[in-house]
Amino acid sequence: MRNPTFGIIVWLGRLMRLPQLSYICIVMLRLKTLTILGSRAELASLPDGKLLINTVNAHSFNTAQKDSLFAEALQQGDVLIPDGVSIVKACKWIKAKSQPTERVAGWDLFAFEMDRLEHRAKELANAADAATGKLPLKVMFMGSSPKVLSLIEKRAAVDYPHLKVVTYSPPYKPEFTDEDNKAIIEAINSANPDLLWIGMTAPKQEKWTYAHWHELNIHCHVGTIGAVFDFYAGTVERAPLWWQEHGLEWAYRLMKEPRRMWRRYILGNVLFLWNMTKE
């Protein structure tokens, strides 16, 4: 006789329009064996050079169970940060290989990397650069809309005055053509940034970056940070500090955007718990 819990999960998978979750037989991604960054302090120990940094939370973990390329992208990236209290707690519960001590949000990664690059740029600045108006280091934002990127440029000019900001808005479509991909790659390689942010929402941003990683002739940290573009631009409000500190940022987003977020957080959290029972 079939376990009634299984029937509930099948129903949830169909309700979330994730039919593959109706057949929970093949596990694409295992939290127990993932290598995950332990804390915000460990960001300072990341090596220089070309480095792919992705994030994982309950939603992306669920999505990876039905998307083999996304699962591979998360596993094969250089650094995976725990962007969710659910990940931190689940790692303890299942006695995973990695035991992160705190949530490291995409915003934490963004703030750390931007501050570090600004500090380096300030040290490199000299009288000649100041006279010509040349900025020594460059950060690139690839993704989102021209409007959001324009707002990012304006804010970054104030927050990080020693950095040159370069942006590229790809076509807004579910999948890029070969011509689209070529144009994006050429834009990134031509810019040759000292820090690259990819913001096209998960799983698109992780899959695209992973698929084209060897075509990117750059030598810098690359972070896939999605919603941070909107947070930094101010087009989407981030949860107040109290909600963040108590691991309730997801609840705040659900409260602000219930129609868009209810599947992700209400049904998705149940599915995540079910996935943890299989670990």
At which residue positions do the language-model features occur?
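Short, low-complexity intrinsically disordered segments enriched in A/P/G/S/L with frequent Arg
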Residues: N3, R17-L21, A130-A131
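Short Gly/Ser/Thr- and charged-rich N-terminal loops/segments
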Residues: W11-R14, N126-A127, A131-T132
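Compositionally biased, intrinsically disordered low-complexity segments enriched in Pro/Arg/Gln/His
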Residues: L15-L18, H119
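N-terminal nucleotide/polyanion-binding subdomain common to many enzyme families
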Residues: S22-A111
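A transmembrane-helix-recognition feature enriched in membrane-embedded lipid enzymes
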Residues: V88-K89, R238-E279
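Conserved beta-alpha
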Residues: I94-E123, G133-A187, A191
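Short, flexible loop segments at boundaries between secondary-structure elements
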Residues: P170-E175, I218-M255
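Proline-aspartate-enriched helix->loop->beta-strand connector
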Residues: I188, N192-W197, T201-A202, T209
